[in-house]
Amino acid sequence: MVIVYFVPLPTKSQHITFTRMNRKRILALIAALITIGVTKAQDTVDIWNLPPLSIEQGRYTTDWDNLSRQYNTPAWWREAKLGAWSHWDPQSAAEDGDWYSRGMYMEGHPQSKFHREHFGHPSEYGYKELCRDWKTDLWDPEDLMQLYQKMGARYFLALGNHHDNFDCWNSKYQPWNSVNIGPHQDIVGIWEKVARKYGMPFGIGFHSTPARTWGQFMPVRYTSDKQGDKAGVPYDAMLTKADGYKPNADGTDKWWKGMDPQDLYGPIHHDGRKSLESPFANQFMWRVDDAIRKYQPDMIYFDDHAGDSQVDLGIDMGLGKLTPQIIAHFYNIADKRTEGRKEVVATFKGVGGRYNSFQRNPEMVGIVDRSLVKSTELYTEDDIMAFPFQTEVSLQEWHYQKGGSYRSAEEIITRLMQNVSRNGCLLLNVTQHGRGNIDDEARQICLDFGRWIDINQEAVYSARPFDVWGNNDVIYTRQGGHIYAVILHPSSNPIVLPALSSQSAS
């Protein structure tokens, strides 16, 4: 909508000479009014009826064969070996573990019981209230980035969104975001600036994929208790924008007046199996594009499968047909931005292995593997891989769990070296409290881990697999004509390295 101001003509006594400067001012005013109108229109965009995203054109196309021929995993990422991850969002505020925004709505679930005891019934205090009350006052991104570097990390990933559907940036296509709601901060934007300041390649993680969010998280919220005093009372996910204009019992306005809960919880649907055909799939593409263009990441991560043949919790998983579109779009944008000087990384799950999402067309696995970096959450490949991969692990729970235990520095070292020896990298989430800080125990583990890497860095950074990766006692890597043997369980006994015998060494 463009607003036009009509200026009355001057009387003879108020005669105005329309000089060139006057005309410039008038044109500037018109341009400003048009800009205001466009901005207003963008602010009120219907995120459930967006046109298809136009894929950025360039040397990469949406054809898998083209992608596999054109793409090379960048040297900066292959040499880095270790990345730090901030897997942190409003769900962290509850401090009751991962997938909280789903479990809190499932009557009988431990997280549902916790939520009612600590916050209230989800008809009165739903996930939108947890987002509203998310505070980040103890978050010190500069301190954490320095810790990540002391830990030995050489790239950093921020959580853009999780399955909860809340965006942690100044999102153009999701009004339920960290600038409008909760901390009123551009979390991703702040992380991006700090990472660049400390010379860390920057990435964004997208977990709000159609299968996870539309298929698994949204439908469980459209219900009510089956038992107890609140039986039959709808949870807050059933509310609409119109409900926000109804005053509270005491006559006050609802805090979310003007916002639409269905933008967070989704339009009510009870069958999320075919999520790629939903209006959410198109919205998801626009949100990814928005973050890519705003923050120019060196890496993007997707917590979902590249193919579409896996089923989880009764839902067809994977980005399927969207995967090559996302990859080509991201690669071409980065290619133009850097004039081809710097390659970027796109990470997806389910490319071969135990969770292969190309079961209907297994011949695609090798082609897809060459087109991106495959992700293996919590699972290290069994042998040396032909193409680089990434394993993601968390120091504690993915979202902070009060009373949860930590992995030791020794376990993280083992995980890292298992990956390096098999042609992979490790991405480590240093679990944050809801308010953004970390425990002293977590800090100490990071420092201990970092000291080990500093001493043994030749066996880590830029290293490549040896002829064999090793065994449960010793792990091998190589670099610059040298072979490194990492002893996992040092003892006073003689060390035997069978892989280096004259019969087996090359």
Question: What is the predicted role of each segment?
Answer:
Residues 32-39:
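Hydrophobic h-region of N-terminal signal peptides that target proteins for export
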